[in-house]
Amino acid sequence: MRKITSVSVGEQLDSFITRMVQSGRYGSASEVMRSALRLLEQQESRDEAVRNAVIEGLESGESSMTLRDIAAERKQKHRV
């Protein structure tokens, strides 16, 4: 179910939205906004995953592996 939400944007973003619609890439300003919000959602999800990985790494302590060991392990795992 769709919900109507009003959003205020500055002239620069309004101009960008208009150009995207006029180019034919999007059928409406709403499509541009939905696309932008989907990208923001994906970016936020990736950022959260990175933050969690950093926290996990910091909490795991120091590794006994050398940089060379880590590189070799990655190469083997990804068959590079």
UniProtKB/Swiss-Prot annotation:
GO terms for biological process: regulation of DNA-templated transcription. The keyword Transferase does not apply. SUPFAM superfamilies: Ribbon-helix-helix. The keyword Protein transport does not apply. Keywords: Toxin-antitoxin system. InterPro entries: ParD, ParD_sf, Ribbon_hlx_hlx. NCBIfam families: antidote_CC2985 (TIGR02606). This is Antitoxin ParD. Antitoxin component of a type II toxin-antitoxin (TA) system. Neutralizes the effect of toxin ParE. The gene is parD. It holds the Pfam family ParD_antitoxin. Belongs to the ParD antitoxin family.
